[in-house]
């Protein structure tokens, strides 16, 4: 393992992949607890780069309830990235002991330039703060780089930004489904985070879509999107992110691992008008290059 990894500290790790068959997933948890003692279960709400629906808070509640029935002292820790403010609850009200996320995603409202948050049981939050600063100091000291006002303003804007992003994700799903591609989630269905997955089945088309979205960006629209390696990933990535905040995924952006079956993951958007413009531009370019036909442009119900 890398320096400072869990393995270096002799902390064992076991992964259970989430699949659409939720019952079999629960069976894997029970089986794992029978074979191993467990201090903490890390639950990833979003789909990441896998082809599955992101977890709902109701599903997270079932997982946490099951884990606590197997071991009441086990900590349920939820990576809540992309999920904040999407549903009418958050995982900490559904049995999670602690959650964490990024401020260049949902809660930052597209204006917070860096940072993250933790929330949940006070003792666990203080433990995280002690790890961030130093033992004995914890949350009583630290630095926010003078971003207090931006963080509060971003939090104030976040519900509206999430609303626009959700409308945009549904429109992306509808457009690509009308073009004949598999999409997840389907348009006009329940969503538990901001991510819209599209299966393009073609590396050249992935590059074309990412480049078109980059060209419609408010920042760096002139840049070429090229595949590149990134630490922590096992394949090259394409990223379209002409965003005001570098790396922001609460702003309209897309990324894709360059591996079969060539899925692209679209998220964010500060207002639906920008997402419409990006989709219109993409469709115009695909028509011009005869990659789609006018017959495939069905009226949208969105």
Predicted regions: what is each one?
Residues 1-163, 167, 173-176, 180-184, ...:
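Conserved PLP-enzyme active-site core in the AAT-like
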Residues 177-300:
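Conserved C-terminal alpha-helix-loop-beta "cap" of PLP-dependent enzymes
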